[in-house]
């Protein structure tokens, strides 16, 4: 018989014994409630059967408890054995970590790595095109700022200060020649002189009045 079948049979017998003990106990109590004398054979038979079922139930319960405790202890031992096996396998797989000289080798490796990191930082600092001082005030140097100002001055439009102006007229702008701030602006165009009136007889003062002269010719 397998282990599972044996456990099932034990549980079934325990359940049957428990049911039988309850039936005989109920019969005994019923007879007692009905006033049957304890000397009555019916009461004696029911009581003895209930007592026997009760004792059997107690014995089976204790047996089941002992078996259960043994099973629990065996489980604890099994767990401990499995734990030890797992620890042994783990240490075997990592036995190189158990070397007493491993700590010294780790310290030496850390020192080598630190030295290599410092060498890398020095190489990066030497290869950098921009030093920390050049970037302290921004990426533009003072010379770059001066160059930008010069570009702005040469590209700005220039105002003619010698051109005649009239009320409401717009100022005349012209870019500087050849892009140089010191170049002279083109001179303004010359104005043609007004023509003089043609010579002729003197104007008659009376002609301006609009009246014809009454005097005949020769007077």
Swiss-Prot record:
| Cellular component GO terms, alphabetical | host cell cytoplasm; host cell nucleus; viral tegument
Question: Pfam families attached here?
Answer: Herpes_UL14
Work out whether the entry's keyword set contains Transcription regulation: no
Q: Where is this region: Disordered?
A: 159-219
Q: Which domain of life is it from?
A: Viruses
Chief location of this protein within or outside the cell: virion
User: What does its PTM field state?
Assistant: Phosphorylated.
Where are the compositionally biased (Pro residues) regions?
Answer: 186-202
Q: Which keywords label this protein?
A: Host cytoplasm, Host nucleus, Phosphoprotein, Virion, Virion tegument
List localization entries. Answer: Virion tegument; Host cytoplasm; Host nucleus
Chain's role:
Contributes to the nuclear transport of the viral transcriptional activator VP16 during the early phase of infection. Therefore, participates indirectly in the regulation of the immediate-early gene expression. Additionally, seems to be important for efficient nuclear targeting of capsids.
Instruction: Report the family membership.
Output: Belongs to the alphaherpesvirinae HHV-1 UL14 protein family.
Spell out the protein name for this chain: Tegument protein UL14
| Organism of this sequence | Human herpesvirus 2 (strain HG52) (HHV-2)
